[in-house]
């Protein structure tokens, strides 16, 4: 099991934090465990409440069913079902940017 440094950013919500996240832990869960509140609703990858956007690094979100190919290609992720696969940077609170 690998552990990665995940930087979570949201200028609007005053979030600039780097957390440790194992490669088998969802980003949302790791953030909550380390005291960072992020938006969520379904926790199943079936809505867009927890959407983020990866600006650096690799994420595995193969369990998601909501985002279309264009959104995934643009770097959007659902933090409730996304695992880090490298050190990465994720803009959080991005649901409004999806549309």
UniProtKB/Swiss-Prot annotation:
UniProt function note: Ferredoxins are iron-sulfur proteins that transfer electrons in a wide variety of metabolic reactions.
Quaternary structure, from the entry: Forms a complex with heterodimeric ferredoxin-thioredoxin reductase (FTR) and thioredoxin.
Source species: Trieres chinensis (Marine centric diatom)
Principal location listed in the UniProt entry: plastid
Compartments in which it is found: Plastid, Chloroplast
CDD domains, per database record: fer2
Keywords: 2Fe-2S, Chloroplast, Electron transport, Iron, Iron-sulfur, Metal-binding, Plastid, Transport
Protein name stated in the entry: Ferredoxin
Cysteine-cysteine disulfides: none
Domain 2Fe-2S ferredoxin-type: 4-96
């Amino acid at each position: 099991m690998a552990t990665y440094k995940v930087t979570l950013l949201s200028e609007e919500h005053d979030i600039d934090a780097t957390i440790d996240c194992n490669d088998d832990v969802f980003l949302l869960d790791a953030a909550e465990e380390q005291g960072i509140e992020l938006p969520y609703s379904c926790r199943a990858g079936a809505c867009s409440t927890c959407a983020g956007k990866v600006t650096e690094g690799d994420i595995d979100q193969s369990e998601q069913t909501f985002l279309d190919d264009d959104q995934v290609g643009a770097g959007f992720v659902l933090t409730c079902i996304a695992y880090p696969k490298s050190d990465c940077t994720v803009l959080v609170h991005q649901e409004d940017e999806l549309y």
